[in-house]
């Protein structure tokens, strides 16, 4: 998807990026980050298309400390990407360039864009589609953890889709190496996907820190979000949302969960364990019954007569199923007036009509808020959490000012 070009998207001049321009021809803008622009680019020798992430590192925009921080983070990201190169579900780093004013990272071009945009279009995904996505994601996370790498920013925006709708994990800006037994204390990530131990660590100096388990919590949030179309943890007052995360307060209350299996709900509950020790690892999650599939049984050695009998019985059975499907139980007026949304055919009719009028912003339950998917803020400090209090708009504004997160 091509984006409109603004003043901040101007290309570096030839002198500042000579080495990059000699090999690649930059094209349209396809994405933006906090301090970067992503463009489609074409390899001059082969004509092959790639995506280039361009980061400006100049004193005009950043302080000396920020400049060094961005450079160090990009070098760390480059090192990790080269270490995990070759995994089918992790984005491939093709080239990297660094000048005095700009840094360039060239990746495979993922034409289908972000999983976030796909989810926004679809509203919610089926269990079958979710199973495929989550299996690939957990395989990538397992590979990272086996190489002592923690991602720390797993979310649908950082999961890309290729032409075959296969996922690639991207954006390793917060990733780092973590030796066995080592703990982290740095506050980073996106509010709705932060694990409880990250929040507790930022508020309690005596907290031991967090480890690779934070990635599995984020996987649980992603799994919930794909199936429900909205995140598990949300409140209009962010301080209460953070408390919900730390206490693991979420519900399968929206109508979408009426048609979801108990198996996937069990997997979510095992990933969204507040205690990281009780949380599933990536390998354990991949062994969960949700990912089991029926393997094709061996072909029967049937005679032609037996094959004919099987075909006849199949046709007869299909006919009976078709007849039974048309025998709809009568709908009484009292049942319709009592709770029309509880009746699946009526519910689908209501949803379809509402969707045509209001698009993706149809709220189907008190706990559902699709707008929360779009609420991302820059990193900031956490306050100490006191008893819950009901407040007026001034109190709410104060809470939000104190709880500015990324």
Curated annotation (Swiss-Prot):
GO annotation, cellular component aspect: cytoplasm; cytosol; phosphorylase kinase complex
GO annotation (BP), single:
glycogen catabolic process
InterPro entries noted in UniProt: Kinase-like_dom_sf (IPR011009), Phosph_kin_gamma (IPR002291), Prot_kinase_dom (IPR000719), Protein_kinase_ATP_BS (IPR017441), Ser/Thr_kinase_AS (IPR008271)
User: What positions does the entry give for ATP binding?
Assistant: 30-38, 53
Specify the Protein kinase domain's residue ranges: 24-291
Tell me the segments the record calls region Calmodulin-binding (domain-C): 346-370
Q: Where is this region: Calmodulin-binding (domain-N)?
A: 306-330
Which residues are responsible for catalysis?
153
Q: Which SUPFAM superfamilies match?
A: Protein kinase-like (PK-like)
| Subunit record text | Hexadecamer of 4 heterotetramers, each composed of alpha, beta, gamma, and delta subunits. Alpha (PHKA1 or PHKA2) and beta (PHKB) are regulatory subunits, gamma (PHKG1 or PHKG2) is the catalytic subunit, and delta is calmodulin.
Report what the protein is called.
Phosphorylase b kinase gamma catalytic chain, liver/testis isoform
Organism, scientific name:
Bos taurus
């Amino acid at each position: 998807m091509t984006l409109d070009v603004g003043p901040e998207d101007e290309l570096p001049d030839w002198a500042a990026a000579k080495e990059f321009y000699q090999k690649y021809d930059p094209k349209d803008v396809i994405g933006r980050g906090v301090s970067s622009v992503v463009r489609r680019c074409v390899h001059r020798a082969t004509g092959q298309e790639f995506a280039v992430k361009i980061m400006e590192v100049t004193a005009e925009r950043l302080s000396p400390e920020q400049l060094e921080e961005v450079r160090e983070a990009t070098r760390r990201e480059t090192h990790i990407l080269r270490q995990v190169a070759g995994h089918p579900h992790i984005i491939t780093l093709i080239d990297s360039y660094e000048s005095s004013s700009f840094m360039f990272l060239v990746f495979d071009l993922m034409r289908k864009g972000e999983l976030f945009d796909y989810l926004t279009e679809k509203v919610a995904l089926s269990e079958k589609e979710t199973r495929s996505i989550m299996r690939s994601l957990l395989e990538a996370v397992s590979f990272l953890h086996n190489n002592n790498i923690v991602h720390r920013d797993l979310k649908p925006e950082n999961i890309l889709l290729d032409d075959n709708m296969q996922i690639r994990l991207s954006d390793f800006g917060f990733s780092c190496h973590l030796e066995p037994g080592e703990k982290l204390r740095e506050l980073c990530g996106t509010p709705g996907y932060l694990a409880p131990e990250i929040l507790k660590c930022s508020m309690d100096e005596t907290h031991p820190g967090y480890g690779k388990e934070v990635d599995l919590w984020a996987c649980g949030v992603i799994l919930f979000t794909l199936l429900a179309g909205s995140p598990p943890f949300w409140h209009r007052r962010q301080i209460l949302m953070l408390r919900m995360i730390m206490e693991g307060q979420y519900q399968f209350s929206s109508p979408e969960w009426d048609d979801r299996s108990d198996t996937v709900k069990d997997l979510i509950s095992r990933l969204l364990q507040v205690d990281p020790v009780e949380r599933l690892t990536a390998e354990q999650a991949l062994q969960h019954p949700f990912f089991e599939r029926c393997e094709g049984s061996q072909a029967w050695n049937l005679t032609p007569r037996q094959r004919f009998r099987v075909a006849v019985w199949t046709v007869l059975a299909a006919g009976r199923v078709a007849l039974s499907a048309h025998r709809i139980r009568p709908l009484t007026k009292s049942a319709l007036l009592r709770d029309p949304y509880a009746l699946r055919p009526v519910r689908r009719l209501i949803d379809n009509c509402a969707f045509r009028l209001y698009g993706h912003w149809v709220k189907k339950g008190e706990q559902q808020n699709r707008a929360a998917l779009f609420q991302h803020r820059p990193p900031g400090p956490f306050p100490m959490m006191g008893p819950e209090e009901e407040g007026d708009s001034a109190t709410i504004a104060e809470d939000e000012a104190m709880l500015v997160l990324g």
